[in-house]
C-alpha cells in the first residue's frame, strides 16, 4: 500500500509465497523490501494470541461490510474519520465533565471559604468565651459535688430517719387500731436505734446521740401505745372460746422487749380469762351447755363419783384450753421463761374456781358415801392432780393444792371407814360356822376388799402411788381379819381350828390373787396356810394310825430303848397283838378313803384336800416302815416276822398310792 495514495495493494498469497520460495537464495534487495517485511510480519502473526488485533478486527467488521475496491481504498479515510468522530464525541463528553468539575470546584471553594470564616468566627468566639467556659466547668464540678452530697444526705435520712407515714403510724391516736404496718415501723425504729451506734464511732457523734435519743423517745411512745392497745384487746377476750388475733400475737412478741409492759399485759389477759373460766364453771354446774346439752353438773350430785368426775373433767378441759390460748398468744415470744409465764398465768386463771370446787367436793366426802366410793373418789382426785400437773406443771399451785387437799381428805375418811369396819369386826367376833367355812363377817369384808382393789386396779393413778396405797389398804383390812379369825377359832379343837383357818386364809388368798401388788401378802398367807396344813396332815396321819391299830405300836417303837430289852417281850407288842393290829391295817389298805377325818370334807379347796391326803399317807407309810424295820430286826426276837407283817413297806406304799 502506497503511503501517499491511500490505496491498499493486495498481493495474492500464492504468488507471494512462490516469490519467497523462488528467492530462497535471493539477494539482500528482496530482504530489505518494506512491503515484503510487512507481508511477512502479517503472515507470521498469530491472531489467536493477539487479543488487541482480534478486538480491532471485530470493530472493523462493524462498519466494513462490503469488500470492494472502493471500500478498500477508502478504508484508511473511513477509519480516520471514525476515529475523529469518536474523539470529538469524547471531547464533548469530557467538556461536560470539565464544566461539572469546575462547578464543583467553585462550590468547594465556597465551602472552604465558609468553613474558614466559621473557623475564624469560632476561634474568636472561643477566645471571647474562655472565661465563661472555665466558670461553667467549675460550676458543673460544684454541681456534681452538691448532687453527691444530696445523695449522701438522702441516704443518711433514709437510713436514720422515719418517713412521715411511719411517724403517723407510731404516733396514732390512743384508741386507734394497731396494724401490721405499725410493727414494721416499730422494727424500723429499733433498727435505726441499733444502726446509729455506728455514728458514735465516727466524727458524727453529736448527730448520732441526737438520733439515738429521738429513736429512744419514739420507741417508748410506741411501746406505751402498743401496751394500751394490747390491754384493751385482752379485756375483750371474755368468751369461753377466744380467738387470739395475729396482731395481738405480734404485740406480745414486740412487748417482750419491755418486760414490765409484757408482764402487765399477761396479767390483764389472766384477769379477763379468770372471770371467764369462773363464769363458765358456774354455768356448767347450774345451767349446762348451750340448749341444755350437756346437762348441768349439779343434776348428777346424787351420784358422787360422776359428780366429782364431771367437775374435774370440766376443769381439766378448761385448763388445757387456757394453756392453748396462752401458747397461741406467746407463740412468737423468744424470751426465756415463756413456759414459766404460761404456767403462772394458767395458775392465776384457774385459781378462781378453787373455792366452789372445794366446797362441793367437801360436801360429797363428808357425806361418807361408803368406803368403795370414797376410794374411787380419792383415786379420781389423784389422777386429775397428776394429769393437770402434767399439762401445766406444778406452778398452778392453788388448783393443784386444792385437788391434793381433797385427795388427802377423801383418803383419810376412806381409811377411817376401813378402820371403823375393822374395829367392828373385833367388837363382836363370830363363832365359826358348823361347816368350818369363812364367817359372814369375813365374806362381807372380803367383798368390800375386792371392790376396793378392783376400783384401784381400774384407776389410772401412777404405778408407784397405786402400790403405796395397796400396801396401806391391805394392812388396814387383812391384819384385823387375820386377828378376828384367830380369835374366832381359839375355842375350837386342833383339827377344827386348822380347817377353819385354812378355809379363811384360802378365801383371802383367792381374793388377793386377782390383783397386782399382792405378792408379798400372798406369800405371807401361803406360809400361814402351810403351817395349818402341817397340823391337818399330822392329825390325819394320827387319825389313820389310831383307827388302823398302829398308833400304839408306832409310839412304842419310837420310844423303845435298848435297855428295855426286845420289843417282843414288851406288853401288847407280842406277835398276837401285832397280828390283830395288822388285820385292822389291812382293812384300811382295802378302803383308805373310809379313814378320812370329817374336817377334810369341809375344806373349800380340793387341791388342799388332796395335798393333805397325799402327805398324811406318806407319814402313814413312813410309820409302817419303821414298825416293819423294828419287827424284822432280830434284836427284837420276833419269831417268823414274815408271818406277822406279810406286806413290805413298798407294797403298802403301792397300795396307798
From Swiss-Prot:
It is a peripheral membrane protein. Required for normal Golgi function. Coiled coil: none annotated. Keywords: Golgi apparatus, Membrane, Protein transport, Transport. This is Conserved oligomeric Golgi complex subunit 6. The keyword Protein transport applies. It holds the Pfam family COG6_N. Component of the conserved oligomeric Golgi complex which is composed of eight different subunits and is required for normal Golgi morphology and localization. It is found in: Golgi apparatus membrane. GO terms for biological process: glycosylation; intra-Golgi vesicle-mediated transport; protein transport. Belongs to the COG6 family. It comes from Bos taurus. InterPro entries: COG6, COG6_C, COG6_N. GO terms for cellular component: Golgi membrane; Golgi transport complex.
Amino acid at each position: 500500500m502506497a503511503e501517499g495514495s491511500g490505496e491498499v495493494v493486495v498481493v495474492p498469497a500464492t504468488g507471494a509465497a512462490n516469490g519467497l520460495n523462488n528467492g530462497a537464495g535471493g539477494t539482500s534487495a528482496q530482504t530489505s523490501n518494506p512491503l515484503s517485511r510487512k507481508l511477512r510480519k502479517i503472515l507470521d502473526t498469530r491472531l489467536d494470541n493477539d487479543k488487541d488485533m482480534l478486538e480491532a478486527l471485530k470493530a472493523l467488521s462493524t462498519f466494513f461490510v462490503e469488500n470492494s475496491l472502493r471500500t478498500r481504498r477508502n478504508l484508511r479515510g473511513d477509519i480516520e474519520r471514525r476515529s475523529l468522530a469518536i474523539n470529538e464525541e469524547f471531547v464533548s463528553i469530557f467538556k461536560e465533565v470539565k464544566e461539572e468539575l469546575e462547578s464543583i470546584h467553585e462550590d468547594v471553594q465556597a465551602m472552604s471559604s465558609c468553613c474558614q470564616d466559621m473557623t475564624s468566627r469560632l476561634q474568636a468566639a472561643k477566645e471571647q468565651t474562655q472565661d465563661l467556659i472555665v466558670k461553667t466547668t467549675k460550676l458543673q464540678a460544684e454541681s456534681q459535688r452538691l448532687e453527691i452530697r444530696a445523695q449522701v444526705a438522702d441516704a443518711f435520712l433514709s437510713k436514720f430517719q422515719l418517713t412521715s407515714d411511719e411517724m403517723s403510724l407510731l404516733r396514732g391516736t390512743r384508741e386507734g387500731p394497731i396494724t401490721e404496718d405499725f410493727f414494721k415501723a416499730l422494727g424500723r425504729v429499733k433498727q435505726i436505734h441499733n444502726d446509729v451506734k455506728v455514728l458514735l464511732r465516727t466524727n458524727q457523734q453529736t448527730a448520732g446521740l441526737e438520733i439515738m435519743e429521738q429513736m429512744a423517745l419514739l420507741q417508748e411512745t410506741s411501746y406505751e401505745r402498743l401496751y394500751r392497745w394490747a390491754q384493751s384487746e385482752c379485756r375483750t377476750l371474755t368468751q369461753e372460746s377466744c380467738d387470739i388475733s395475729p396482731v395481738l400475737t405480734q404485740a406480745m412478741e414486740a412487748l417482750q422487749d419491755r418486760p414490765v409492759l409484757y408482764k402487765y399485759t399477761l396479767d390483764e389477759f389472766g384477769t379477763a380469762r379468770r372471770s371467764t373460766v369462773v363464769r363458765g364453771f358456774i354455768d356448767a354446774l347450774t345451767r349446762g351447755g348451750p340448749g341444755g346439752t350437756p346437762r348441768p353438773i349439779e343434776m348428777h350430785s346424787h351420784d358422787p363419783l360422776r359428780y366429782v368426775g364431771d367437775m374435774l373433767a370440766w376443769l381439766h378441759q378448761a385448763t388445757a384450753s387456757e394453756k392453748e390460748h396462752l401458747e397461741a398468744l406467746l407463740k412468737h415470744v423468744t424470751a426465756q421463761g415463756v413456759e414459766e409465764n404460761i404456767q403462772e398465768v394458767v395458775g392465776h386463771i384457774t385459781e378462781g374456781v378453787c373455792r366452789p370446787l372445794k366446797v362441793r367436793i367437801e360436801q360429797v366426802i363428808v357425806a361418807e358415801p361408803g368406803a368403795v366410793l370414797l376410794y374411787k373418789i380419792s383415786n379420781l382426785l389423784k389422777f386429775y392432780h397428776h394429769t393437770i400437773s402434767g399439762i401445766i406443771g406444778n406452778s398452778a399451785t392453788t388448783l393443784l393444792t386444792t385437788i391434793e387437799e381433797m385427795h388427802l381428805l377423801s383418803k383419810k375418811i376412806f381409811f377411817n371407814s376401813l378402820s371403823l369396819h375393822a374395829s367392828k369386826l373385833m367388837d363382836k367376833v363370830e363363832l365359826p360356822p358348823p361347816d368350818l367355812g369363812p364367817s359372814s363377817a369375813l365374806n362381807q369384808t372380803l367383798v368390800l376388799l375386792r371392790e376396793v382393789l378392783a376400783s384401784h386396779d381400774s384407776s389410772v393413778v401412777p404405778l408407784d402411788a397405786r402400790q403405796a396405797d395397796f400396801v396401806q389398804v391391805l394392812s388396814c383390812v387383812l391384819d384385823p381379819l387375820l386377828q378376828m379369825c384367830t380369835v374366832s377359832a381359839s375355842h375350837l379343837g386342833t383339827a377344827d381350828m386348822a380347817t377353819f383357818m385354812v378355809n379363811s386364809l384360802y378365801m383371802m388368798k383367792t381374793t388377793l390373787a386377782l390383783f397386782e401388788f399382792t405378792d408379798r401378802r400372798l406369800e405371807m398367807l401361803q406360809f400361814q396356810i402351810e403351817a395349818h396344813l402341817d397340823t391337818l396332815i399330822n392329825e390325819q396321819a394320827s387319825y389313820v394310825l389310831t383307827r388302823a391299830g398302829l398308833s400304839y405300836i408306832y409310839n412304842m417303837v419310837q420310844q423303845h430303848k435298848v435297855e428295855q430289852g426286845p420289843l417282843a417281850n414288851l406288853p401288847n407288842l407280842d406277835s398276837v397283838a401285832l397280828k390283830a393290829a395288822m388285820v385292822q391295817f389291812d382293812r384300811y389298805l382295802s378302803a383308805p378313803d373310809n379313814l378320812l377325818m370329817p374336817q377334810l370334807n369341809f375344806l373349800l379347796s380340793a387341791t388342799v384336800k388332796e395335798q393333805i391326803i397325799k402327805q398324811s399317807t406318806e407319814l402313814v407309810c413312813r410309820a409302817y416302815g419303821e414298825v416293819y424295820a423294828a419287827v424284822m430286826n432280830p434284836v427284837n426276837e420276833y419269831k417268823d416276822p414274815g408271818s406277822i407283817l406279810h406286806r413290805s413297806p413298798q407294797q403298802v406304799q403301792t397300795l396307798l398310792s
